[in-house]
Design a protein with these regions (language model features):
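Positively charged n-region of N-terminal signal peptides that target proteins for export
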Residues: 1-4
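Bacterial N-terminal signal peptides
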Residues: 6-16
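Active-site-adjacent, His/Asp/Glu-enriched structural segments that form or flank metal-binding
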Residues: 54, 63-176, 195, 205-223, ...
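Scaffold signal of the M16-like zinc-metallopeptidase fold and its non-catalytic homologs
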Residues: 87-89, 110, 114, 118, ...
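Acidic/histidine-enriched alpha-helical segments
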Residues: 94, 98-102, 150-168, 179, ...
Length: 472
């Protein structure tokens, strides 16, 4: 990902059907095409036959555990454990997991991978579906990662150099400046001091017991989801999940971690330059309480947010295409800070000789919209474009990729994003889009583009910023 600060607002896709005129208080339940449920130990599963792409199966083990769960002596160990999962389990010691998968034509990197973030660790497999036995074996591998990683001392010591080299890569200017933004965005929260890459001194010196302590406390079935999407038999997959995960036990002494992100009164500002920076960036983030769409009626405000972002994007695109554009590009979106807060993000790539002008133009445009709102013409155009997009997604629903679906189910597990299906979502758009009026959108703008919870951060090259300061 080029920048954490670039957020593209995507219309999410799934597959469920409800009749027209859905009552606003209707709870949006999961798509009936998904075999969805929980084992008695709390493990969640999502199983979904899907034929696009053909003859492929996608697997995920999603764990609600990341760097924010680390103790002060474990900084970086959530990510380190992710590496260790590929270094041997009770049934597949040493490199046998990778050897087994690669012998079946599955490549490490594109089809075998994992990632760790602040609040989650995700293990991913993608396989051809022509060997039904391989599906069961991949579910077994997920089960091994969930509870039976060996964590041999020699393997830990061998892996230190690999992870420390990743840490070194994260010391480049782009990461230093990104961390400055995150420090301001996560100010006064646990996230501000829990970067997933960790602290090098801890990576160099931690003991096996510290790593085992993290694994045993946070890798529990009530914090896990298993997802299998693709060319599969759902009943067989469910049976295999039950076989490999039902015996897993929870930790009765697991702690509750404060994962809140404060929404400050007023505006937080920051400027940071770096002699190794290669570009200049301005970010405006506005934090608001976490917003969900659990009920059908919630979709109306959700659609208003989409229209707002799309119309703001059009405004900034017009500035970019002007005769003397004040910046090179701008990205606008709406996203979540985990399950703690939601936020609007404007990210602007600034010209070397126009940092001050670019920031001023961006802030002035936000102020103009806040004061005067949008026009009826802008709203009608945005509504027509959004409806056209949703119609296209609905018409092409049989070509919804398994990768897209599994990403959506991951968001459902981590953020409670509803997964009712594209049929239901299409009905909701058709139901609510015609009802949304300009006054409603502009009222949303007035309430949303406020100074509380606002974070303004500019980063880049010293020579481009000159004497620009936060006060100026």
């Amino acid at each position: 990902m080029k920048k954490f600060t670039t957020f593209l607002f995507l219309v999410f896709i799934s597959i469920f059907t409800i009749s027209a005129d859905i009552a606003p208080d209707t709870v949006l339940t999961p798509d009936s095409a998904i075999t969805f449920g929980k084992l008695p130990n709390g493990l969640t599963y999502y199983i979904r036959p899907n034929s696009y792409p053909e003859n492929r199966v996608f697997f995920r083990l999603v764990v609600k555990s990341g760097s924010v769960m680390e103790d002060d002596d474990q900084l970086g160990l959530a990510h380190f454990f992710e590496h260790m999962a590929f270094n041997g389990t009770e049934k597949y010691p040493g490199n046998q997991v990778i050897d087994f998968l690669e012998k079946n034509g599955i490549q490490f990197g594109p089809e075998i991978n994992a990632y760790t973030s602040y609040d989650q660790t995700v293990f991913m497999l993608e396989i051809p579906s022509d060997k039904s036995q391989l599906v069961d074996q991949c579910i077994e591998v997920l089960g091994q990662w969930a509870a039976y990683v060996k964590l041999e001392q020699q393997d830990i010591d061998d892996e230190r150099g690999v992870v420390i080299e990743e840490w070194r890569q994260h010391q480049r200017a782009e990461y230093r400046l990104q961390e400055f933004l995150l420090d301001n965005l996560f100010k006064d929260s646990r996230f501000a001091v829990r970067n997933p890459i960790g602290k090098v001194k801890i990576l160099e010196t931690f003991t096996r017991d510290q790593l085992v302590r993290y694994y045993k406390e946070w890798y529990t079935p009530d914090r896990m989801a298993v997802m299998v999407i693709g060319d599969i038999d759902a009943a067989s997959v469910k049976s295999s999940i039950e076989k490999n995960f039902s015996s897993l036990k929870n930790n009765p002494h697991q702690r509750i971690i404060d994962m809140s992100v404060p929404i400050e009164a007023g505006t937080v500002t920051g400027i940071k330059t770096d002699p190794e920076a290669t570009e200049n960036q301005f970010d405006m983030c506005i934090k608001v309480p976490f917003q969900q769409n659990k009920l059908a009626g919630d979709y109306r405000s959700y659609i208003v947010r989409i229209l707002f972002c799309n119309m703001m994007s059009d405004r900034f695109d017009q500035l970019r295409r002007s005769q003397n554009p004040p910046f090179m590009s701008a990205n606008i979106g709406f996203s979540h800070l985990f399950s703690s807060a939601s936020f609007f993000n404007l990210g602007v790539d600034l010209k070397d000789n126009g940092v001050r002008e670019g920031i001023e133009k961006a802030c002035n445009e936000i102020a103009r919209v806040s004061q005067h709102g949008f026009t009826q013409t802008e709203l009608e155009r945005a509504k027509a474009e959004l409806l056209s997009l949703v119609e296209s997604l609905h018409n092409e629903k049989d070509k919804t990729s398994s990768a897209s679906l599994i990403n959506e189910y991951t968001r459902n597990f981590m953020e409670d994003e509803p997964i009712p299906g594209i049929d239901t979502e299409y009905e909701l758009y058709c139901q609510y889009l015609p009802l949304i009026q300009l006054e409603e959108v502009n009222s949303f703008v007035q309430n949303y583009l406020k100074k509380d919870g606002r974070v303004l951060v500019a980063t880049g090259k010293p020579q481009s910023f000159g004497d620009l300061t936060e006060a100026s």
